[in-house]
Amino acid sequence: MYRAGVTLLVVAVVSFGRWDSVTVATTIRVGWWYEPQVKMAYIYEHNDTNLTIFCNTTAYDSPFLASGMMIVLPHRTQFLTRKVNYSEDMENIKQNYTHQLTHMLTGEPGTYVNGSVTCWGSNGTFGAGTFIVRSMVNKTAGNTNTFIHFVEDSELVENPAYFRRSDHRAFMIVILTQVVFVVFIINASFIWSWTFRRHKR
C-alpha cells in the first residue's frame, strides 16, 4: 500500500505539470475558450453632465455570452447594466453572440471625469477592457457639438483587480478539475487491478 501511495503521488504531480501545459494549449485552440472581444465608446456631453457609454461584446463559437459594464469613481463603484444569452444545448450547440450595451449617467458637471469604465464579457473565460473617462467639453467659442469617442487600444488601462483575480481563478479551476479527474482515474484503475488480482488468486 505504501508503494502504491508513493506512485500515485508522483503520477499526480507529473499529471499536474502535463495538464498545466495541455490546458494552456487547449485554451488557445478550443473555439469557445477564445475570450470575448470588447469594443467601447462614449459621449460626455452638456458641459460634462451626461455620460453615455457604449459597449459591444462579441464571442464566437460559444455556448453562452454574459456581458456587463461598471464604473469606478473615487468614492463608489457602480454596476450599470448586464446581458446574458445562451444556447438551449450548451454542451453541443455553439453560437456567435454580440451584445450591444448602452447606459447613460447624469450628474453634476465633471462628476465622471477620470472615472474608470470597465466593459466585460464571459463565455467561459473573461474578455474585459477598461478606459478612463475624459472631458469632452469643447472650449471653442460657439462650438457646442459633442461627438462620440471610440476608445482605442492605446487608451486602455489595467482592469480592476476583480477581473484579474477572476481570470486566474477560472484558469486554476480548469487545471485542478483536470488533476482531480486524472487522480480519480488512477485510483479507479488501481482498485480495479488490485480487486482483479485478488479474485484471480
Curated annotation (Swiss-Prot):
Keywords: Glycoprotein, Host membrane, Membrane, Signal, Transmembrane, Transmembrane helix
Subcellular location: Host membrane
Glycosylation-annotated residues: 47, 50, 56, 85, 96, 114, 123, 138
Ranges annotated as spanning the membrane: 171-191
Cytoplasmic side: 192-201
GO cellular component: host cell membrane; membrane
The keyword Membrane is assigned to this record: yes
Membrane topology summary: Single-pass membrane protein
Membrane topology, Extracellular segments: 26-170
Signal sequence, start to end: 1-25
Annotated family: Belongs to the HHV-5 UL120 protein family.
Annotated protein name in UniProt: Membrane protein UL120
Encoding gene, per UniProt annotation: UL120
